[in-house]
Amino acid sequence: MNTYLKPFELTLRCLGPVFIGSGEKRTSKEYHVEGDRVYFPDMELLYADIPAHKRKSFEAFVMNTDGAQATAPLKEWVEPNAVKLDPAKHRGYEVKIGSIEPRRASRGRGGRMTRKKLTLNEIHAFIKDPLGRPYVPGSTVKGMLRSIYLQSLVHKRTAQPVRVPGHQTREHRQYGERFERKELRKSGRPNTRPQDAVNDLFQAIRVTDSPALRTSDLLICQKMDMNVHGKPDGLPLFRECLAPGTSISHRVVVDTSPTARGGWREGERFLETLAETAASVNQARYAEYRAMYPGVNAIVGPIVYLGGGAGYRSKTFVTDQDDMAKVLDAQFGKVVKHVDKTRELRVSPLVLKRTKIDNICYEMGQCELSIRRAE
């Protein structure tokens, strides 16, 4: 191998469920629930198995997205039409369902406090390869590494909270883009402008996709918010996630040639000390925040957050709580006034992103990182 290229082996062990979405949603007409498991048949094979004279009826059932029929489960058509779901014929795969938490208590008729029970609806699918096997894209992990690097710079340079001028989403984005350009667009390649993406130091880092995982590594997880009073709120959003305990591996290669040739000499040191850097970011960014939530134990060490549903704090380098609240108000202010609540509770974001599996709470996206030099 070229002596400029330094390979590493990165491993992420899921402590909580990890969601990397494919952009697809599976409706209740595309799966069958049996106890605590969901069976996703191959819909093409299922359709081919339906007698020809019943196919128009099935098509009408699947395509009907109005009224009560919009959320009708698959069994409402297959059972009365004597079509037996058979994994041997219809292939597909089966996934366990995590615990489903009711909505937070609200006042109902007669002034009584009640919690609305929820059932599965649309399920956001995990990304899969052409053979239907889940995997984690290298681009997702590279984005996580980029966030860790920028967050570590922020926490090393100042003990004061990082402020963002203005409070609109656009202003926050522009400030973030300027910060990234200043810290990362340093290659200075010939015949380019300083702000060009080709001058980004992270161009020198390549991350492979993970090896294919198994569908048995997946779990259906509900989005659940927990406030600082320890009260959970189950939301009607469900995702296919990698289950806690799953290990994900990636090969990471850094080009240490001169920056003008697209390399990043200091990138080798960044990867060598990545576990220590992740641990310091975890301590600076999450320790005090997580301590605000009752029953949430502090976890020290190289803890990182990967994928969707992990919360705003994992996606930004801003540390000032009031500024976080302003940005969140700009995005979601019609629902909750984050600024007012942050001043009252002294925490932002206002909820911890969690889910339940067998009635045990987990944080979304939480992983333990390890890295070593590779051959």
Curated annotation (Swiss-Prot):
Any GO CC annotation of this UniProt entry: plasma membrane
Biased composition range(s): Basic and acidic residues: 168-186
GO aspect biological process, one term: defense response to virus
Record note on disruption phenotype: Deletion of the entire CRISPR-Cas locus (cas6 to cas2, Rv2824c to Rv2816c) decreases resistance to plasmids encoding spacer elements about 6-fold.
CDD domains with a match to the protein in the record: Csm5_III-A
Region (Disordered): 167-195
Any GO molecular function: RNA binding
UniProt entry tagged with the keyword Phosphoprotein: no
InterPro entries: CRISPR-assoc_Csm5, RAMP_III_fam
One Pfam family in the UniProt entry: RAMPs
Keywords, alphabetical: Antiviral defense, RNA-binding
Annotated family: Belongs to the CRISPR-associated Csm5 family.
Role according to the record: CRISPR (clustered regularly interspaced short palindromic repeat) is an adaptive immune system that provides protection against mobile genetic elements (viruses, transposable elements and conjugative plasmids). CRISPR clusters contain spacers, sequences complementary to antecedent mobile elements, and target invading nucleic acids. CRISPR clusters are transcribed and processed into CRISPR RNA (crRNA).
Quaternary organization: Part of the Csm effector complex that includes Cas10, Csm2, Csm3, Csm4 and Csm5.
Miscellaneous: Encoded in a type III-A CRISPR locus.
Protein name: CRISPR system Cms protein Csm5
Organism: Mycobacterium tuberculosis (strain ATCC 25618 / H37Rv)
Gene: csm5
